């Protein structure tokens, strides 16, 4: 049983993109390569328990075990030493990636307060899209009662598109609600 969005990509989105950008081959159509979820937990320096909670929440959201990220350099003003654990990240690929995107677009984003669509200016010039989420409570897996602190996370959607225009069209076809 492959993911719903993956089937939609193969049957509907690919032909639409080939027609719009007049690719000579179906293999030229941009596709989503991976989705990276990153949660920076700066306060883990003073309280390591915060990092454990963030790792657990990220695991619930993504459905796989997060990787704990460590500080590359020491920064005295932040009381940070090199090698200290200061965040967590997850890289989603394949069916899990499509299922997460489906859940993000259809369930989580509509739950954001005062939501008018995601910014269309968050492309990086290489066809990748970055989205910041202010609170982890928009995800259905997170139980409101078990949350001690509201944390945000970054969601990076890496595509094989060469331009931002192609990438935006790809994400629009998937149903990403861009603010005009």
Curated annotation (Swiss-Prot):
Top-rank taxon, per record: Bacteria
InterPro entries: Ribosomal_uL5, Ribosomal_uL5_bac-type, Ribosomal_uL5_C, Ribosomal_uL5_CS, Ribosomal_uL5_dom_sf, Ribosomal_uL5_N
GO biological process: translation
MF term (GO), any: tRNA binding
Keyword terms, alphabetized: Ribonucleoprotein, Ribosomal protein, RNA-binding, rRNA-binding, tRNA-binding
Cellular component aspect of the GO annotation: ribonucleoprotein complex; ribosome
Signal peptide: none
Pfam (any one): Ribosomal_L5_C
Subunit structure: Part of the 50S ribosomal subunit; part of the 5S rRNA/L5/L18/L25 subcomplex. Contacts the 5S rRNA and the P site tRNA. Forms a bridge to the 30S subunit in the 70S ribosome.
Function: This is one of the proteins that bind and probably mediate the attachment of the 5S RNA into the large ribosomal subunit, where it forms part of the central protuberance. In the 70S ribosome it contacts protein S13 of the 30S subunit (bridge B1b), connecting the 2 subunits; this bridge is implicated in subunit movement. Contacts the P site tRNA; the 5S rRNA and some of its associated proteins might help stabilize positioning of ribosome-bound tRNAs.
Protein family membership: Belongs to the universal ribosomal protein uL5 family.
Annotated protein name in UniProt: Large ribosomal subunit protein uL5
Species of provenance: Levilactobacillus brevis (strain ATCC 367 / BCRC 12310 / CIP 105137 / JCM 1170 / LMG 11437 / NCIMB 947 / NCTC 947) (Lactobacillus brevis)
């Amino acid at each position: 049983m492959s993911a719903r969005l993956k089937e939609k990509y193969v049957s509907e989105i690919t032909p639409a993109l080939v027609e719009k950008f007049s690719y000579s081959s179906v293999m030229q159509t941009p596709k989503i390569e991976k989705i990276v979820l990153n949660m920076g937990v700066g306060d883990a320096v003073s309280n390591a328990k915060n990092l454990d909670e963030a790792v657990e929440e990220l695991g619930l959201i993504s459905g796989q075990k997060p990787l704990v990220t460590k500080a590359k350099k020491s920064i005295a003003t932040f009381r940070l030493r090199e090698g200290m654990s200061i965040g967590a990240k997850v890289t989603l690929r394949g069916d899990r990636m499509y299922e997460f995107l489906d859940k993000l677009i259809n369930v989580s984003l509509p739950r954001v307060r005062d939501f008018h669509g995601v910014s269309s200016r968050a492309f990086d010039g290489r066809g990748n899209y970055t989205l910041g989420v202010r609170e982890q409570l928009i995800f259905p897996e997170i139980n409101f009662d078990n949350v001690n602190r509201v944390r945000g996370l970054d969601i990076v959607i890496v595509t094989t598109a060469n331009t931002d225009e192609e990438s935006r069209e790809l994400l629009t076809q998937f149903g990403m609600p861009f603010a005009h």
